[in-house]
């Protein structure tokens, strides 16, 4: 099903109370380029927007969320799940740096570090 402009506007309105409003700044060296400063989100990346929208649109019967990640999406989903009061499990490979693993755990997610690659960590979902 294609995503429409109305879908995008609805998602934007839905997540607005839950994400930071980040600035849009002009790049002085590239006058036709504007930068959206999503690094200012609480989780440090734009992925919080999609994760929050996904959690907010879960069926009411959903009891938990699970994902595989190399870090940023896992952190975003852990943040969104914590805000919604539902448990999150994030499957990571052994390649993910310890600081990212810690950040996800600090948001209350259960972390499963397994697999020599991200593809192999998907097996545990």
Ranges and model annotations:
Residues 1-123:
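PLP-dependent amino-acid enzyme catalytic core
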